[in-house]
Amino acid sequence: MRSLSRTDQVISSLDKALSTVFAAHSASRPAPKPAVDPGLAMTPQDKSLSASLMRVNHVGEVCAQALYASQALGTRNETLRAQFEHAAREETDHLAWTEARLAELNGRTSWLNPLWYAGAFGLGLIAGRLGDAASLGFVVETERQVEQHLLQHLDRLPVADVESRAIVAQMREDEARHAAAAEHAGAATLPVPVRWMMRGMAKLMTSTAHRI
């Protein structure tokens, strides 16, 4: 299979950005669909809370697409590029699932998705410039933070919202696997100040996306 030229890779990254932010998405795997207990009815308040939380999760997947796209662009290691691209395809499932669930809840995606994508893409490029080990370390830390964030959402999502809870649980399982794969590929441990900075940026994103 012919390797893409640098120009082709940049064009592909631009196309990925536009499709992630503006296009509808299809999943390669069906969304988890648990049996619904007819005795568990969601109130309007439940739906509003779930929509806000799933919007935050959707933003997280927009950022994941940007991170993996930029890191795939930054590495010259074809095996590592393939790993990033595979993880991005799984994250596309998450993007499609959260998007569809938001529609079911009469919610909406974040108005700031172009900004979230651009910021995450820039961070991924910086990580990529620091070398493959640092780039993989960035993946590990990101996925661990997302995994913890999803666990917190499982505590906050209404008990009656079994559909959203099933989606978030599967997403958390996938994120843990992505972190483990990055560790196995040779991830470096990021300095503590960098991890703190990443947590601060993630907190800003989640608190903003919860509302807009």
From Swiss-Prot:
<keyword id="KW-0408">Iron</keyword>
<dbReference type="GO" id="GO:0006744">
    <property type="term" value="P:ubiquinone biosynthetic process"/>
</dbReference>
<dbReference type="GO" id="GO:0008682">
    <property type="term" value="F:3-demethoxyubiquinol 3-hydroxylase activity"/>
</dbReference>
<dbReference type="InterPro" id="IPR009078">
    <property type="entry name" value="Ferritin-like_SF"/>
</dbReference>
<keyword id="KW-0472">Membrane</keyword>
<feature type="binding site">
    <location>
        <position position="91"/>
    </location>
    <ligand>
        <name>Fe cation 1</name>
    </ligand>
</feature>
<comment type="similarity">
    <text>Belongs to the COQ7 family.</text>
</comment>
<comment type="pathway">
    <text>Cofactor biosynthesis; ubiquinone biosynthesis.</text>
</comment>
<dbReference type="InterPro" id="IPR047809">
    <property type="entry name" value="COQ7_proteobact"/>
</dbReference>
<comment type="function">
    <text>Catalyzes the hydroxylation of 2-nonaprenyl-3-methyl-6-methoxy-1,4-benzoquinol during ubiquinone biosynthesis.</text>
</comment>
<keyword id="KW-0831">Ubiquinone biosynthesis</keyword>
<feature type="binding site">
    <location>
        <position position="175"/>
    </location>
    <ligand>
        <name>Fe cation 2</name>
    </ligand>
</feature>
<feature type="binding site">
    <location>
        <position position="61"/>
    </location>
    <ligand>
        <name>Fe cation 1</name>
    </ligand>
</feature>
<protein>
    <recommendedName>
        <fullName>3-demethoxyubiquinol 3-hydroxylase</fullName>
        <ecNumber>1.14.99.60</ecNumber>
    </recommendedName>
</protein>
<feature type="binding site">
    <location>
        <position position="94"/>
    </location>
    <ligand>
        <name>Fe cation 1</name>
    </ligand>
</feature>
<keyword id="KW-0479">Metal-binding</keyword>
<feature type="binding site">
    <location>
        <position position="178"/>
    </location>
    <ligand>
        <name>Fe cation 2</name>
    </ligand>
</feature>
<feature type="binding site">
    <location>
        <position position="143"/>
    </location>
    <ligand>
        <name>Fe cation 2</name>
    </ligand>
</feature>
<keyword id="KW-1003">Cell membrane</keyword>
<feature type="binding site">
    <location>
        <position position="175"/>
    </location>
    <ligand>
        <name>Fe cation 1</name>
    </ligand>
</feature>
<dbReference type="GO" id="GO:0005886">
    <property type="term" value="C:plasma membrane"/>
</dbReference>
<dbReference type="Pfam" id="PF03232">
    <property type="entry name" value="COQ7"/>
</dbReference>
<dbReference type="InterPro" id="IPR012347">
    <property type="entry name" value="Ferritin-like"/>
</dbReference>
<feature type="binding site">
    <location>
        <position position="91"/>
    </location>
    <ligand>
        <name>Fe cation 2</name>
    </ligand>
</feature>
<keyword id="KW-0560">Oxidoreductase</keyword>
<dbReference type="GO" id="GO:0046872">
    <property type="term" value="F:metal ion binding"/>
</dbReference>
<keyword id="KW-0503">Monooxygenase</keyword>
<dbReference type="InterPro" id="IPR011566">
    <property type="entry name" value="Ubq_synth_Coq7"/>
</dbReference>
